[in-house]
Each structure stands twice: as structure tokens, then as C-alpha cells.
């Protein structure tokens, strides 16, 4: 029989202090019954002697200290998981949001998860095709990797997220592919866009959606990514699926963390965020990966908006330390009408070399990637020079590089949000663009690949 406490001492923001408690443990799930019979949930955030600090998931509005009854349930916050979750939409706490019935779970899992033993990890080395050339060709995503997208306010990261979720697949694999999508603190319009896009394209059949709206309690945002990852771990490591987890927007998650930290009167760190922000983010990002002897995997694409487009802001800064690269969206390219506006030069996938090459993508992938990077960088330099000194100051070769840079942005990077390119199409397009330059300038590509692919590209022009 669970004890019922009527000793609520104080409620401040999303926190409740309960006095005279016994045998309560950290992270324990709490049920609060209000004077009108309404029930809410929370979790134990801190224990000090006979006092417990409870974090409320549904907010504290309407709670009367004298009439509230509190029960400590002796278990952490759990999610009931089953393969029937595929094709369903849930709120940030795992309750059905699509009008469908509740899931009959195969098992219930603690949403905090269990860290993967480093010795049991398998190295990520299998290519994931997203259908986006700027990612597949130049900043390749590898199965088991965590590759964030750094965006800015007003940039089309939602469209890019939906495109990747719709198009992503593992080549040459018999295993099922699933997408777990977590929208954190999103607007109603954006949430509806995701649901409609997934439903219209049929992608929802292989997807699980967790949607936390902007007007939902901020505390729910702290649980949402963990709910999504718990579902992903079950599908990956119990059902052998390749799972792609897309989370947007991590900035909203960090704001919720800051709100709780301020309510607890903790000493703030950089820009008011708690000093443990790095540790907390790592508990989310480090749940990606592959396990030796298991067929499935979890690949993460967390999306965050950089306040004032500042890469040195604590959220992108700390995310960059934990994850394996970043895809950066550019406001300058967006203004030019290039969609998706991926700035390939500062973007980076640290594991791209492991997922490309013969029998993975194609033998010439690494060489063409290096040549495209070098040529685009030189082309941008030539264009900047022409702005300062005038086009007449450029050599004939510089003019070709400037022409290449424009064609690269207009044809390779810009493909819209509905075009799904195979890796073969992406590599062939790269070769086609390289024909703009003289053969003598293609110094980063081996002669055998030049002979094999350059002639084909020139013939197809």
C-alpha cells in the first residue's frame, strides 16, 4: 500500500516541496491528486533528509497546497513500448495524441535508459542515404552516428528534418528502417506540418512521432527526447531495426532546463544555463550508436536553432563537443533562394570517411568530395576578390572557379525539399560540375578515376 502525503509545503513554478517523506528515491515517479480529483504527474528531483523536491510535468497552475495529496509510486517515469507504436503520434509524455487507442506494451522501460558500455559499442561505418546531396556527397551520415543540424531562427530546418525523415534509408540492408521523430516545444503549425507531411507521403507507417507543443508545460520538454530515445532503443536493440532519431528543437529543451534550474535557485553557468548542461546533453546524445552482436542501430540528427546565429552560444558549442560533426544552415544561402541552405564548408561529418568508398557508396567518392570542397572554396574566394577588385582583375582560371561556385550552389546544394537523389546521382552531378574546370585543376582526384568518370560526365553534358 502506497503512503499518501498531505504535507505539500510550497509550490514555486514547476516545482513542489513535500515535507515529512520516508523511503523516497531520486527520479521516482510522483502522482499528485488535486482537491477537485484531477491527477498530475511529477518526478523526484532532489531529496534532503525528510523533504522531497518534485518536478511537475503538467505545471503547477491550480494546485492548492492544503488540498493536494501526493503519492510516491516507487518507480521512475516509464514508457510502454511495442512495435505497434509505428505509425502513431504521441504527446511529449508518451500519451496517444492521434485519437487512436492506447498502446498495449510489450514491456515498460525507464525513460532515462541505460548507457551503452563503451566496450560493447560497434564502430559506425555504414552509409545512410538521406537523398540530400550536400549531406550524402560531402558530409556523409553514417549508421550509429550523431550528426546535429545547426540552424537559425526562420531558416527552413523543419522542412529539412521532414525531408530526411521521409527519404532516409540504409543501402544494401535487409533490416527494417524506422524513424523516431521528437518535436520539442514546437508551434501548433509546425507540429501539424510534420504530421501532415508524414501522413501524406506515407512515411508515418515506419515512424513514431512525439510532439511537445510550445504551450505544453516546459517540464514536459525535458521528458520528450528521452521518451523518443526509449522507443528508439526498443525498436533498434530488441526488434533489430535501423532507427533514425530526429529531434527538433534542442534549444527549447535547454531553455526548459534553464527554467527548472532557475526555479531551484541553482548557481547559473554561461548565459544563465545550468553548469551541468554539457552532462545533461550528453545523456541524450550518447544514446546513439551500435552494439556488438545486435543487428539494429540508433542514428541521431538533433536540430537546434542558434540564438542570433551565434556558433559560440553554449548550446551549439557544447553540442559540437559531444556529437560527431555538424550540418550548418546559412542565412546568406537562404536569402539567395538555395534550398536546403546547407553551408558545406563549415559543415563537417567526422565519420564520413568510414561510410564511403567501394562497396559502400562508390570508389571515387572520397576523391570527388575533396575536389568539390577545394573547388568551391577557391570559387568563393574568386567571387570575393571580384567584389573588391572587379571581375577584370580575375584570371581566366579564377573566372571558371567563380562560375563553378555559382553552379555548385545552384545545382548541387539547391535541390528543393522534394527531390530525392540517390548517391549515384549525387556523385554523377559532382563530376558534371567538375567539367567546368580544366582537367589540370583536378589535382585531388586519382588519374584512374579521371579516366573512368570524367569522360562519361563530359559526354552527358
Curated annotation (Swiss-Prot):
Annotated transmembrane regions: none
* A single GO BP: proton motive force-driven plasma membrane ATP synthesis
Tell whether Transport is among the UniProt keywords: yes
Which keywords annotate this record?
A: ATP synthesis, Hydrogen ion transport, Ion transport, Transport
Q: Which InterPro entries match?
A: ATP-synt_VA_C, ATPase_a/bsu_AS, ATPase_F1/V1/A1_a/bsu_N, ATPase_F1/V1/A1_a/bsu_nucl-bd, P-loop_NTPase, V-ATPase_su_B/beta
Q: Known CDD domains for this protein?
A: ATP-synt_V_A-type_beta_C, ATP-synt_V_A-type_beta_N, V_A-ATPase_B
**Protein family:** Belongs to the ATPase alpha/beta chains family.
Under what name is this protein listed?
A: V-type ATP synthase beta chain
Amino acid at each position: 500500500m502506497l503512503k499518501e502525503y498531505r504535507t505539500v509545503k510550497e509550490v514555486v513554478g514547476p516545482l513542489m516541496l513535500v515535507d515529512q517523506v520516508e523511503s523516497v528515491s531520486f527520479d521516482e515517479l510522483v502522482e499528485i491528486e488535486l482537491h477537485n480529483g484531477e491527477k498530475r504527474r511529477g518526478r523526484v528531483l532532489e531529496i534532503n533528509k525528510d523533504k522531497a523536491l518534485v518536478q511537475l510535468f503538467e505545471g503547477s497552475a491550480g494546485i492548492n497546497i492544503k488540498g493536494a495529496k501526493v503519492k510516491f509510486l516507487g518507480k521512475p517515469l516509464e514508457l510502454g513500448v511495442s512495435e505497434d507504436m509505428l505509425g502513431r503520434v504521441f504527446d511529449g509524455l508518451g500519451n496517444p495524441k492521434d485519437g487512436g487507442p492506447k498502446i498495449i506494451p510489450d514491456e515498460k522501460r525507464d525513460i532515462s535508459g541505460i548507457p551503452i558500455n563503451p566496450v560493447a559499442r560497434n564502430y559506425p561505418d555504414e552509409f545512410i542515404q538521406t537523398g540530400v546531396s550536400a549531406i550524402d556527397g560531402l558530409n556523409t551520415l553514417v549508421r550509429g552516428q550523431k550528426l546535429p543540424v545547426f540552424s537559425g531562427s526562420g531558416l527552413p530546418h523543419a522542412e529539412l528534418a521532414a525531408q530526411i525523415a521521409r527519404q532516409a534509408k540504409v543501402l544494401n540492408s535487409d533490416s527494417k528502417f524506422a524513424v523516431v521523430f521528437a518535436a520539442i516545444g514546437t508551434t501548433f503549425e509546425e507540429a501539424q506540418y510534420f504530421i501532415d507531411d508524414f501522413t501524406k507521403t506515407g512515411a508515418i507507417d515506419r515512424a513514431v512521432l512525439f510532439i511537445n507543443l510550445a504551450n505544453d508545460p516546459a517540464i514536459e520538454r525535458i521528458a520528450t527526447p528521452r521518451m523518443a530515445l526509449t522507443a528508439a532503443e526498443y525498436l533498434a536493440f530488441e526488434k533489430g531495426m535501423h532507427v533514425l532519431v530526429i529531434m527538433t528543437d534542442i534549444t527549447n529543451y535547454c531553455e526548459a532546463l534553464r527554467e527548472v534550474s532557475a526555479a531551484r535557485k541553482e548557481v547559473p553557468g554561461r548565459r544563465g544555463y545550468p553548469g551541468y548542461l554539457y552532462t545533461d546533453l550528453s545523456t541524450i546524445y550518447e544514446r546513439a550508436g551500435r552494439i556488438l552482436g545486435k543487428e539494429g542501430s540508433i542514428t541521431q540528427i538533433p536540430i537546434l536553432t542558434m540564438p542570433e546565429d551565434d556558433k559560440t552560444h553554449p548550446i551549439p558549442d557544447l553540442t559540437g563537443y559531444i556529437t560527431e560533426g555538424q550540418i550548418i544552415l546559412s542565412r546568406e544561402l537562404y536569402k539567395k533562394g538555395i534550398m536546403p541552405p546547407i553551408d558545406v564548408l563549415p559543415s563537417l561529418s567526422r565519420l564520413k570517411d568510414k561510410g564511403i568508398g567501394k562497396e559502400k557508396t562508390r570508389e571515387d567518392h572520397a576523391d570527388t568530395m575533396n575536389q568539390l570542397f577545394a573547388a568551391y572554396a577557391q570559387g568563393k574566394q574568386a567571387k570575393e576578390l571580384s567584389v573588391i577588385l572587379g571581375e577584370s582583375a580575375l584570371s581566366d582560371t579564377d573566372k571558371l572557379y567563380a562560375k563553378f561556385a555559382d553552379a555548385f550552389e545552384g545545382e548541387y546544394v539547391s535541390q528543393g525539399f522534394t527531390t530525392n537523389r540517390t548517391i549515384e546521382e549525387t556523385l554523377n552531378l559532382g563530376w558534371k560540375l567538375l567539367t567546368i574546370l580544366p582537367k589540370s585543376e583536378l589535382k585531388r582526384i586519382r588519374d584512374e578515376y579521371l579516366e573512368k568518370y570524367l569522360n562519361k560526365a563530359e559526354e552527358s553534358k
